């Protein structure tokens, strides 16, 4: 999709420039007595840290960009405080002390953030929502489990080694319906991971069925050519008893309607309108609306959607960059939102993480929605 220069070369140039910036910033440290006696410490320590940073950042799509981003942010904050102190008349000794802290503290804070973000990413939660409706439901209730934005790989929060944990949490919810709202796989997914997760979906007992809508990564080549194709995905889903919905409306025997939309980005917006998916408009059938990206909520509600389930945002994943980017493009970043008196939207934070085992915003979760007829 993108030229290799913008994907890989430009990020490396930017990473190198930031490394040099951090090195120069570190040299602002005052030449203390120990440093004066051992000049190698004054120049060698920041150089060593710069080399460490360069090693961490060797993959422009990896965790290094997150590490550098936090480190630069903390450096800027510290330097800003030091310059402010100088401007308001702080003593030279005090200002130098701030500069010293500006050299050491960002590394300590960044190390803590990286540790905490990893723990947060790897903690798989079950998030439960309770909704009521006046429409008829099978046995007066409906329980839906939503899986979204998994993309399994060794460097991310979810891979085949965590399938037993995921299976246990899904089974504990006892779903009537299993829905997979896109980006379950991506262009970095290996065939073995595809097969393992499709096998998992086949093992899940969901009496009312299992449904899948595509996201912008499942078959869309953002970064590289994937090692599997559409036929492989369709075959794996079919074997697992999962139905792929692409601008499709399905009526279940129990009277519940499932609508699955094509992804907006994957199709460049070339998809059916909400009204075209339910030509008759709202009726007395409870309608579950699956759309990978949280957008077009009002039109979906007007067409007859009672519950909209989406993903895509990862709940922001890396604060604040993720929050700013997602809010700008989507109608909801994470969680539950009341669209109308009869329609509710829920956006998952993702059952995995994108790119790396790191999360400072949102939750790594499966979503369990309990709908009761009143």
Q: Which positions does each model-derived feature cover?
A:
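Non-catalytic terminal accessory segments
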Residues: 1-124
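Soluble catalytic domains of enzymes that build or remodel membrane lipids, polysaccharides, and related
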Residues: 136-374
């Amino acid at each position: 999709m993108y030229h290799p220069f913008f994907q890989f070369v430009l990020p490396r140039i930017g990473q190198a420039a930031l490394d040099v910036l951090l090195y120069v910033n570190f040299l602002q440290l005052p030449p203390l007595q120990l440093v004066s006696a051992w000049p190698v410490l004054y120049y060698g320590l920041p150089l060593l840290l710069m080399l460490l940073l360069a090693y961490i950042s060797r993959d422009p799509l990896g965790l290094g960009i997150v590490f550098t981003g936090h480190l630069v942010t903390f450096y800027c904050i510290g330097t800003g405080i030091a310059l402010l102190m100088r401007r308001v008349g702080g003593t030279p000794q005090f200002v130098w002390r701030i500069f010293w802290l500006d050299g050491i503290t960002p590394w300590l804070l960044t190390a803590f953030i990286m540790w905490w973000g990893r723990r947060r990413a790897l903690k798989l939660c079950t998030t439960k929502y309770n909704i009521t409706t006046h429409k008829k439901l099978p046995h007066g209730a409906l329980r839906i489990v939503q899986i979204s934005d998994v993309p399994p790989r060794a460097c991310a929060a979810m891979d085949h080694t965590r399938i037993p944990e995921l299976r246990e949490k899904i089974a504990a919810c006892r779903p009537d319906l299993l829905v997979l709202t896109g980006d379950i796989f991506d262009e970095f997914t290996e065939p073995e991971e595809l097969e393992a997760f499709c096998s998992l979906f086949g093992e899940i007992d969901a009496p009312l069925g299992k449904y899948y809508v595509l996201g912008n990564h499942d078959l869309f080549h953002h970064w590289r050519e994937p090692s599997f194709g559409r036929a492989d995905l369709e075959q794996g889903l079919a074997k697992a008893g999962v139905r792929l919905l692409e601008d499709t409306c399905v009526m279940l025997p129990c009277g519940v309607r499932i609508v699955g939309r094509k992804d907006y980005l994957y199709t460049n917006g070339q998809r059916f309108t909400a009204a075209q998916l339910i030509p008759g408009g709202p009726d007395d059938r409870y309608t579950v609306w699956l759309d990978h990206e949280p957008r077009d909520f009002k039109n979906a509600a007007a067409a007859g959607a009672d519950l909209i389930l989406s993903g895509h945002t990862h709940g922001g994943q890396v604060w604040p960059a993720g929050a700013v980017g997602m809010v700008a493009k989507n109608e909801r970043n994470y969680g539950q939102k009341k669209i109308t008196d009869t329609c509710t939207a829920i956006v998952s934070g993702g059952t995995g993480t994108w790119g790396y085992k790191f999360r400072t915003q949102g939750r790594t979760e499966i979503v369990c929605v309990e709908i009761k007829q009143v």
